[in-house]
């Protein structure tokens, strides 16, 4: 009888330790520098206050490193990418990563220092687009919606320049690394830039874009975990902390309304 009581006490104590360890688990979350970092700071604060979760934010300046760090185990989560980009990374790199929650749609837009509308665009003008596969497709789809090009019907979210079957304005389309696109504005008719790098250069789609991606975009950004930690209570708490009005209000402040709630 004493042995059974002792075993029961040990089991209860073990469960207590497990619960305590889970609550004490510190999350390392990868984010991109700039406004997205500031938005995640609010989520981290809520995670601590509401769920007693300590969150360390690891800041990156590129789109390649956060997934490699997460897959390696140097991070517990990251929050910077949409699903088409994640799917492409998984296919190319073999990462064991999964989305665990939505954040916002940050619409891409065309920006220009040379023209105020497409009516001023000239035949043969040079334009700039992102060169990474997913955001290149996103930019090409946006160009097609403006009737500037036509893509193959089956190109979909993996469209590349070889899928352009009509270019009636004979536009020269330059593919540039995303962080460098704002620097091209002095040299091209317009550049298609995502919200992160536009915002870092004082640009917002609703105010400065000559045309903008709409609310029906499939490119909602994600909170991403590894397959082996996706069901962690700590991960779930961070997602709940992010998907709050406080975070939405901070994003609205940082992005000046240039985002759409994804949850």
UniProtKB/Swiss-Prot annotation:
The lineage of its organism: Bacteria, Pseudomonadati, Pseudomonadota, Gammaproteobacteria, Pasteurellales. A lipid is attached at residue 20 (N-palmitoyl cysteine). Belongs to the NlpA lipoprotein family. The keyword Membrane applies. GO terms for cellular component: cell outer membrane. This is Outer membrane lipoprotein 3. The gene is plpC. It comes from Mannheimia haemolytica (Pasteurella haemolytica). It is found in: Cell outer membrane. It comes from the Bacteria. A lipid is attached at residue 20 (S-diacylglycerol cysteine). Residues 1-19 form the signal peptide. CDD domains: PBP2_lipoprotein_IlpA_like. It is a lipid-anchor. PROSITE patterns: PROKAR_LIPOPROTEIN. It holds the Pfam family Lipoprotein_9. Keywords: Cell outer membrane, Lipoprotein, Membrane, Palmitate, Signal. The keyword Lipoprotein applies.
């Amino acid at each position: 009888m004493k042995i059974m009581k002792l075993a029961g006490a040990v089991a209860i104590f073990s469960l207590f330790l497990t619960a305590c360890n889970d609550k004490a688990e510190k999350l390392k979350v990868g984010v991109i520098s700039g406004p997205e970092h500031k938005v995640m700071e609010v989520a981290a604060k809520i995670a601590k206050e509401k769920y007693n979760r300590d969150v360390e934010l690891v800041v990156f300046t590129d789109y390649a490193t956060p997934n490699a760090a997460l897959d390696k185990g140097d991070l517990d989560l990251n929050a910077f990418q949409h699903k088409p980009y994640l799917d492409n990374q998984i296919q190319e790199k073999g990462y064991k990563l999964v989305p665990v929650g939505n954040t916002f749609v940050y619409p891409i837009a065309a920006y220009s220092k040379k023209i105020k509308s497409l009516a001023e665009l000239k035949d043969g003008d040079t334009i700039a687009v992102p060169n990474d596969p997913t955001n290149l497709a996103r930019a090409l789809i946006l160009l097609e919606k403006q009737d500037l090009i036509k893509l193959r019907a089956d190109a979909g979210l993996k469209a590349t320049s070889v899928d352009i079957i009509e270019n009636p304005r004979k536009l020269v389309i330059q593919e540039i690394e995303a962080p460098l696109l704002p620097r091209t504005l002095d040299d091209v008719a317009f550049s298609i830039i995502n919200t992160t790098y536009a915002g870092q250069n004082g640009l917002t789609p609703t105010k400065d874009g000559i045309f903008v991606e709409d609310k029906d975009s499939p490119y909602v950004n994600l909170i991403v975990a590894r397959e082996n930690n996706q069901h962690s209570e700590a991960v779930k708490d961070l997602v709940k902390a992010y998907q709050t009005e406080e975070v939405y209000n901070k994003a609205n402040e940082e992005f000046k309304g240039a985002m759409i709630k994804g949850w």
